[in-house]
């Protein structure tokens, strides 16, 4: 699985066991992701941050 890094022109191959790509937004600004990468389980959203997860190459 290939996931985008914070700057989407760069990507990385996820290590074994991390089979989701994610991007994290601050709830106060849902237009600019503050973090992207590989993850094993999609975190729950909170009052401050929102996560979007997906399982195809460079979907984040």
Curated annotation (Swiss-Prot):
GO molecular function, one term: toxin activity
Record localization: Secreted; Target cell membrane
InterPro entries xrefs: Cytotoxin_Cobra, Snake_3FTx, Snake_toxin-like_sf, Snake_toxin_con_site, Toxin_cobra-type
Gene3D superfamilies according to UniProt: CD59
Disulfide-bonded cysteines: 3-21, 14-38, 42-53, 54-59
GO BP annotations listed: killing of cells of another organism
Pfam families for the chain: Toxin_cobra-type
Tissue: Expressed by the venom gland.
SUPFAM superfamilies in alphabetical order: Snake toxin-like
This protein's GO CC annotations: extracellular region; membrane; other organism cell membrane
The UniProt record lists the keyword Isomerase: no
Keywords associated with the record: Cardiotoxin, Cytolysis, Disulfide bond, Membrane, Secreted, Target cell membrane, Target membrane, Toxin
Function: Shows cytolytic activity on many different cells by forming pore in lipid membranes. In vivo, increases heart rate or kills the animal by cardiac arrest. In addition, it binds to heparin with high affinity, interacts with Kv channel-interacting protein 1 (KCNIP1) in a calcium-independent manner, and binds to integrin alpha-V/beta-3 (ITGAV/ITGB3) with moderate affinity. Preferentially binds acidic phospholipids like phosphatidylserine, phosphatidic acid and phosphatidyl glycerol.
Subunit-level organization: Monomer in solution; Homodimer and oligomer in the presence of negatively charged lipids forming a pore with a size ranging between 20 and 30 Angstroms.
Protein family: Belongs to the three-finger toxin family. Short-chain subfamily. Type IA cytotoxin sub-subfamily.
Descriptive protein name: Cytotoxin 2a
Species annotation: Naja naja
């Amino acid at each position: 699985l290939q996931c985008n890094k914070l700057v989407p022109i760069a990507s990385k191959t996820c290590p074994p066991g991390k089979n989701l790509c994610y991007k994290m937004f601050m709830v106060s600004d849902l237009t600019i992701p503050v973090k992207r990468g590989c993850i094993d389980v999609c975190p729950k959203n909170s009052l401050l941050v929102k996560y979007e997860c997906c399982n195809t190459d460079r979907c984040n």
